[in-house]
Curated annotation (Swiss-Prot):
Subunit structure: Efficient DNA binding requires dimerization with another bHLH protein.
Name this protein carries in UniProt: Neurogenic differentiation factor 6-A
Gene that this sequence comes from: neurod6a
Organism: Danio rerio (Zebrafish)
Chain spans, region Disordered: 17-85
CDD domains referenced in this protein's UniProt entry, alphabetically: bHLH_TS_NeuroD6_ATOH2 (cd19722)
InterPro entries, sorted: bHLH_dom, bHLH_transcription_factors, HLH_DNA-bd_sf, NeuroD_DUF, TF_bHLH_NeuroD
Phylogenetic classification of the source organism: Eukaryota, Metazoa, Chordata, Craniata, Vertebrata
Amino acid sequence: MLTLPFEDPVIMDTQFGANFPRDCVGDLKGNKQEPFEKEETLSHVMDDDDSEKDEDEREDGQDENGLPRRRGPRKKKMTKARVDRVKVRRMEANARERNRMHGLNNALDSLRKVVPCYSKTQKLSKIETLRLAKNYIWALSEILSTGKRPDLLTFVQTLCKGLSQPTTNLVAGCLQLNARNFIPDQISGEASFSGRSPYESVYSTYHSPSVVTPSGPSVDAVKPFRSFNYCSSYESFYESVSPECGSPQFEGPLSPPINFNGIFSLKHEEPVEYGKSCHYGTRYCAVPPRASIGQSARGSSDLHFPYDIHLRGQFYPVQDELNTFHN
């Protein structure tokens, strides 16, 4: 077995000294201790930075007056380039908003030309235009689904659902319909309307042969007018019916009208000849308009007028009755 004695210094020196000289051992030991020294220096630097930050925070914690300051991110300094960038971004945002509003207004103007509401003096608001367009689209879809043409009153009621009164008047005027013929507040959710006037159940209709009902889009909604016989008191004095009166002809002669001679007296008085004492003139005298002068002069005492003839110089017998009643 080949072994080398440890006491031989020559062999050890030649074998070890060829690769690693003895002078390098001290250098290696010195190099191994350098990283620890660097860590110590870094720790000292970080401690110094922390102390500076603490001092800054202490300084920022109070202002000149000793009041606490706001903590948070510090505001960046406004340089000229940054001011220009902010101004450009703001101008671009304003231009986008302006273009958006112009496009919206143009679309609403186009929509106002389509909906059935036109006025030269009044312009619909944005919300009223959108509501009317929604009702119009819904009404057209109902027409397409049912395949029947609706009544004009029903169509207008559908269009005016949820609209204000001025817009309702405009729509009714555009469709040539009176806005009083329907009540938009009583419209239900579905378009099931009878097409009749809501006032028809309150007022009973009066059918007269002398009155002609006007023809219109909704005949049922128009309330016929009633003829009043204003000339019925004069018809008993003539053989034929007066053409100015709208009342029907009478089947037989009527009794003379009742005379109102006083407040509390309601009785029929016999005709009195007033022609003898008429030098003061007459008042409240109702002369038949169609009678000629000769007929009125010849039959003045025989005819009985619907109103009393009061003479200025005449004493009434009813006055005595009134005085007796009050005394």
